[in-house]
């Protein structure tokens, strides 16, 4: 019996065995990502793909300053409104800035035909050469070129007119038919602007041009149009009952344009040889211009970012991220960040990849924790970690490269009569924007799911690598841990980690320890059976004694009559 009790004591006294665990890195990161199946998954590492900040400044673009139109708009600048004289010397820019209160446009009232299309053309121009297409001094010898001035375009209190146009009127009582041609030899497109004057009365027509039935004809290989003045009474605008309509065309290299008129011509004086590029644009912004430089400009401010997406503004100029409506686009690069609960013991829940990661392992994503007589410690598996880092880095770079189509996105121009087209265009643009946003978000969700699954797969592979080496020299105890059936010193532990574990060397010791443990289990079962029998007999005796005592007490006080028959 003493031997049995000794075996039972041994069964409840377990010596601490050598142990090795497979696990993964955890840290104090609070980064969260979304996946297809989950939201706000905390991860150890992640990269942001969405730029949401700007510097609040209008800057030079790649070292080239923008053209700030100030109180002028594009029309006032190109026509040469006297209030825009400071812009006459501008010949190159990175982009063009209008403000919300750019009031100086056409000074003489009238309509600028196809003005929105002209703005679109100028959006792709980064510089031009302003030159006299028809010199004022000798191009119109039979007509007056100095009397065409008006109070509508006054400057510093004196009558004036556009700096790039000539208002040609009769000389004396004669306005002979004029004809003037220009052949483009600039080697690039030339922007030519002219106008047609529409007087309010026939007397004004005669006093200015003499000819009652005047016309203006403009023709090139691509443009051909004849204009006749529309004489009619109109309400005064800026003190003028007359109107001027403004026209423009682009003349190709080698092409010739001819102006013919018997009156009412607002002739071109200066024209513009255009240098086109893809990086310019026109933006409307009240943001101040600063002495700074950027690669991407929005009306709100400059973006200095290499990220593939931004949600600052849909209008951009330069090498800019794609605008999306998203508020968060974060891609996971690390693992699920689930630090283990330290109070649960070294080889409880904290030890494995099932319930939590290790904050103590800081030099890799996956690795080992061991404990033996020589101590305990963490060690990262550098090979699997490096392979994972390379794979995920390549994936992130590939995603950024594919989605990082940087370009200029400027607003399209529509006049007041094209509201339906403008509204339709906005709907189309919104549709494309929704598609871009959906694609970006879906891409990130899918890649995050794949990345986290990839990490889980790598940890599982590391676990299977250890398991296949140890075989029956150790047993699985959960949470990614193995308990050795033999003593495993630091050299032994290192061999498990680097894949050189010598199974035959430890198999005999492991076999003996397994058999001893199994024997203890069998002896323990015998003890448990003996104790169960003793416990049953003792319980029965106690029950019988209790019943006898109760019966004796009841007989003694008359509650129970006892008759003994012989």
Curated annotation (Swiss-Prot):
Pfam families, per the entry: Hemagglutinin
SUPFAM superfamilies on file: Influenza hemagglutinin (stalk), Viral protein domain
Topological region Cytoplasmic: 551-566
Molecular functions (GO terms): host cell surface receptor binding
Signal sequence residues: 1-17
Membrane-spanning ranges: 530-550
Gene Ontology terms describing biological process: clathrin-dependent endocytosis of virus by host cell; fusion of virus membrane with host endosome membrane; fusion of virus membrane with host plasma membrane; viral budding from plasma membrane; virion attachment to host cell
Keywords tagged on the record: Clathrin- and caveolin-independent endocytosis of virus by host, Clathrin-mediated endocytosis of virus by host, Disulfide bond, Fusion of virus membrane with host endosomal membrane, Fusion of virus membrane with host membrane, Glycoprotein, Hemagglutinin, Host cell membrane, Host membrane, Host-virus interaction, Lipoprotein, Membrane, Palmitate, Signal, Transmembrane, Transmembrane helix, Viral attachment to host cell, Viral envelope protein, Viral penetration into host cytoplasm, Virion, Virus endocytosis by host, Virus entry into host cell
PTM annotation: Palmitoylated.
Cysteine disulfide partners in this protein: 21-481, 59-292, 72-84, 107-153, 296-320, 488-492
Its membrane topology: Single-pass type I membrane protein
Glycosylation sites recorded in the entry for this protein: 27-28, 40, 104, 304, 498
A single Gene Ontology CC term: viral envelope
Site feature (Cleavage) residues: 344-345
Superkingdom of source: Viruses
Major location (coarse): virion
InterPro entries referenced in this protein's UniProt entry, alphabetically: Capsid_hemagglutn, Hemagglutn_HA1_a/b_dom_sf, Hemagglutn_influenz_A, Hemagglutn_influenz_A/B
Lipidation (S-palmitoyl cysteine): 555, 562, 565
Localization per Swiss-Prot or TrEMBL: Virion membrane; Host apical cell membrane
All ranges on the Extracellular side of the membrane: 18-529
Function field: Binds to sialic acid-containing receptors on the cell surface, bringing about the attachment of the virus particle to the cell. This attachment induces virion internalization either through clathrin-dependent endocytosis or through clathrin- and caveolin-independent pathway. Plays a major role in the determination of host range restriction and virulence. Class I viral fusion protein. Responsible for penetration of the virus into the cell cytoplasm by mediating the fusion of the membrane of the endocytosed virus particle with the endosomal membrane.
Miscellaneous remark of the record: Major glycoprotein, comprises over 80% of the envelope proteins present in virus particle. The extent of infection into host organism is determined by HA. Influenza viruses bud from the apical surface of polarized epithelial cells (e.g. bronchial epithelial cells) into lumen of lungs and are therefore usually pneumotropic. The reason is that HA is cleaved by tryptase clara which is restricted to lungs. However, HAs of H5 and H7 pantropic avian viruses subtypes can be cleaved by furin and subtilisin-type enzymes, allowing the virus to grow in other organs than lungs.
Assembly and binders: Homotrimer of disulfide-linked HA1-HA2. Interacts with human CACNA1C.
Family membership: Belongs to the influenza viruses hemagglutinin family.
Protein name, entry field: Hemagglutinin
């Amino acid at each position: 019996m003493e031997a049995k009790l000794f075996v039972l004591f041994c069964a409840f006294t377990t010596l601490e065995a050598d142990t090795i665990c497979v696990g993964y890195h955890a840290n104090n990161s609070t980064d969260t990502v979304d996946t297809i199946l989950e939201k706000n998954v905390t991860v150890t590492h992640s990269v942001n793909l969405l730029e949401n900040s700007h510097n609040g400044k209008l800057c030079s673009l790649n070292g080239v300053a923008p053209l700030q139109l100030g109180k002028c708009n594009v029309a006032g600048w190109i026509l040469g409104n006297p209030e825009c004289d400071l812009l006459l010397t501008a010949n190159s820019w990175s982009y063009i800035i209008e403000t919300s209160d750019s009031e100086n446009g056409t000074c003489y009232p009238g309509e600028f035909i196809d003005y929105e299309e002209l703005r679109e053309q100028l959006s792709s121009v980064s510089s031009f050469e302003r030159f006299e297409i028809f010199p004022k001094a000798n191009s119109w010898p039979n007509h007056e070129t100095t009397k065409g001035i008006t109070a509508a375009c006054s400057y510093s209190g004196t009558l004036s007119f556009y700096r790039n146009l000539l208002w040609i009127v009769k000389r004396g009582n004669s306005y002979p038919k004029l004809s003037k041609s220009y052949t483009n030899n600039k080697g690039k497109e030339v922007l030519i602007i002219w106008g047609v004057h529409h007087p309010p009365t026939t007397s004004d027509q005669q006093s200015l041009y003499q000819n009652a039935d005047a016309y203006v004809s403009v023709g090139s290989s691509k443009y051909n149009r004849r204009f006749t003045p529309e004489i009619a009474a109109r309400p005064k605008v800026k003190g003028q009952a007359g109107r001027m309509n403004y026209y423009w065309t682009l003349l190709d290299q080698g092409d010739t344009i001819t102006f013919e008129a018997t009156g009412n011509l607002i002739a071109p004086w200066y024209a513009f040889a255009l240098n086109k590029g893809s990086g310019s644009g026109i933006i409307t912004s009240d943001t101040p211009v600063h002495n700074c430089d950027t690669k991407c400009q929005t009306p709100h401010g400059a973006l200095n970012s290499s990220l593939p997406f931004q949600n600052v503004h849909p209008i951009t100029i330069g090498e800019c991220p794609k605008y999306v409506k998203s508020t968060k686009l974060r891609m996971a690069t690390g693992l699920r960040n689930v630090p283990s609960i330290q109070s649960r013991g070294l080889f409880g829940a904290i030890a494995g990849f099932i319930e939590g990661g290790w904050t103590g392992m800081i030099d890799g994503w996956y690795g080992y924790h061991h404990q033996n007589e020589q101590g305990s410690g963490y060690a990262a598996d550098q090979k699997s970690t490096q392979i994972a880092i390379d794979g995920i880095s390549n994936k992130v770079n590939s995603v950024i490269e594919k989605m990082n189509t940087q370009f200029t996105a400027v607003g399209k121009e529509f006049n007041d009569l094209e509201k339906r087209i403008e509204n339709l265009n906005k709907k189309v643009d919104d549709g494309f924007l929704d598609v871009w946003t959906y694609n970006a978000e879906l891409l990130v969700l899918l890649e995050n799911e794949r990345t986290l699954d990839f990490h889980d797969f790598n940890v599982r592979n590391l676990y299977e690598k250890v398991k296949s080496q140890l075989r029956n020299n150790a047993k699985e105890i959960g949470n990614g841990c193995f308990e050795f059936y033999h003593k495993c010193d630091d050299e032994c532990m290192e061999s498990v980690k680097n894949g050189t574990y010598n199974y035959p060397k430890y198999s005999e010791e492991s076999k003996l320890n397994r058999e001893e443990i199994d024997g203890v289990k069998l002896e323990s079962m015998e003890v448990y059976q003996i104790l169960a029998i003793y416990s049953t007999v003792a319980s029965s005796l106690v029950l019988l004694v209790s019943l006898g005592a109760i019966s004796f007490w009841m007989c003694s006080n008359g509650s129970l009559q006892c008759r003994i028959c012989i």
